[in-house]
Amino acid sequence: MDWERPLTIYDEVPHIDYTFRLADGSITTWDDVYSQRTLGIAECLEIASDNPQCVYGELRNPQDRWPNGYSYEALQAPIGYLPFALADIVTIDEQGDHYSQIRQLRFVNVGLWLLFAAAWTLLIVQVTSHRLAAAAASTIVALNPLLFDRFTYVTNDGPAIIASTATSAWLIFGLRHRTLSWPRTIIPALAIGTIVGLLKPTALIVLLPILLAGWASARFADSRRPPMRWWLSVILIGAAGAVASFAYSAYIEARSSLDFHTVLSVILPRGPLGLADASVLRLEDISELVTGSGARNDAVTFEWGLRSPTVWVLGFAVLGAAAFLVSLTLRSAAFDRIPALDARVLGISVVVGFIAVLIAHPALHYVRGEFLMPFTSGRFQAPLIPLAGLVVLPAFLRFRGWAWAAIVGGLLVAAFAS
C-alpha cells in the first residue's frame, strides 16, 4: 500500500478539498473552486516533487485542473468526511510537505477499516455461530479488492460501507428478534436512515437485497413471514435517508449562486451517447467488479488506490465466487441463527442488487441526456459485498476443508502476493 502515491484523477482531489474546507469550518457549495492547498498537494504528488515547500511554492490557477477547478463534491453531506477533517485539525501541519499531509490523511483509513471490521462482526454474528465458517467468510470479504480499495484513499466511500454494513446488521437483528416494540423499531430506523442519507445515499442500496430476501424467504423457502414492523423499519430507513439527502441538496442549492446542473454540464460535457456505446461501457464495468477499478485501462495503479491485483488475488476472488455459487446450489442453506433468512434467496437478491446498480447508473445519465464518463459504478455496489459475504457461509459449513483453504490461502495472499 503506497500512502504517498499521486491523487486519483477523478474523485480524490475534490474529496480532499471538501475535507480541508470542513476542517476550516465551512461547507463546500457549488460555487467553490479548489483551494491553493488542494491544488498544491495534487500537483506536487503528480510530479513527485522533493521540495518540502512545493505546496505553497507558487500560485496555481484552479481552472487548470479538471473540471474547470470546480470542487464538485458539494452534493455530499459532511458526515462522511468528519474523520478526515478531524485528522486535519488534530494531526496535520498545514505548512508541512505534500507527502506528510497526504500520508496522514490516508492513514485515517486504518481506523475506518477497524470500524468496518466491527460492523462486519455485528453483521455476521446475527446469522451464524460457527467460527470456522465465519472466519473463512471474513477472509473472503476482507480481501475483496473492490471493497478494500474503498479504504485506501480520501473519500466518503469507506464510511458509507461501514454505515451500510451496520444497517444490514440492524435489519437482520430485527428479523431475529421479532418481539421488538414499535418504538424500538421505528425510532432507530428513522435515526439510521437520516444518518445514512447525510453520509452517502448510495449506501441505502443494501435495502434492496434485504427487502427481496425477506419477502422471497417467506414465499419460497418455507420461512416465517417477517412482522409488519420489520417491513416498516426498512421503508422508514429508505424514506428518512431520501428526505435527509434531498433536504441537504436543497440547502446547498440555496447557499450557491451556481446549481448542480451547471457544474454537472462541465463534468459531463458531451451528450448523449448512443445506447450501444453506453452498453459497451457497462460491459467493461463487469470486469471491474472482479478485478478492481484499474482493469479497463490495464493500468499499473487503480484509479482509486491500490496496485492492480495480482493473479493470486484474482485466484482468491475466484475461490470466493465459487463458494458463493456453491451456496446457491445447496438444498439446505438456512443460517443457523436465523432460519427465517435463506442464504440462497439472499444470494440471488444480492445479484439482483448488483445488476440493478449496473443498469440504473448509466440509465440515469442516458435518460437525462448526459455523457457517461468511463468510470465504474462498482464503487456504488461495494456496500453489497458484506451481504455477499454472508452467502458463502453454507458452503464453508458443508465443506470445512474449503474453509481452511480460504483462511490459510487468504493470509498467504495478503502477506506475500497482494
Language model segments and positions:
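Membrane-lumen/periplasm interface segments of multi-pass, membrane-embedded glycan/lipid transferases
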Residues: A247-S332
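Interfacial juxtamembrane loops and adjacent helix segments
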Residues: A23-R106
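Specific aromatic-rich, kink-prone transmembrane helix
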Residues: A119, P159-T179, I192-G193, L387-A388
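Perimembrane helix-loop-helix junctions
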Residues: R176, V206-A242, L330
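Membrane-interface alpha helices of multi-pass inner-membrane proteins
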Residues: R184-P201, V206-L212
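Transmembrane-helix motifs of polytopic, lipid-linked glycan transferases
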Residues: S100-V127, A166
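Short acidic/glycine- and proline-prone juxtamembrane loop motifs at membrane-interface regions
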Residues: L146-A160
